[in-house]
Amino acid sequence: VVESLGTDKVIFLPDHYLANYVQKNTKVKIISWQGTCMVHEKFTGKEVEDIKKENPGIEVIAHPECPPDVISASDFAGSTSSMVKYVKENQPKKVLLVTECTMSDNVQVENPNVQFIKPCNLCPHMKKITLNKIYDCLKNETNEIKIGHNIAEMARKSVLRMAEIG
């Protein structure tokens, strides 16, 4: 995605660790925003190494928003969809997904033969979303965010282009 922009420098946000991960995989100069994901930032490389010692043969799959020591201690790092694909295609006997723990629950449903080790870091912001709240928003048409047509069109183009690139 970064290289498809046709520039030699990109301002990358919102996550500093993801920017560092992307920088290692491109020649484009990345200028990163110093934000992080509070869930991924809680994990440590030592924690991953300890889990590997306690669970011989476990495959550790990390999200690139994790700190570099976590990525280094992992067997695979990739986007959320890449993590899901990795589990589905490789069917490891035992796996640790280094990301928000609800994701492990969802992936486990689709991969019942895989044992998931879950050091649970929950995202308090994701937990604010409930089925009842979604139902109320749809039923009452509340909490709508309105943006201008021009901004919506630019955002739509960006999202479609990103999906096209992969």
Q: Which sequence ranges carry the predicted segments?
A:
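The feature marks the mature, well-folded catalytic cores of soluble enzymes
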Residues: 1-166
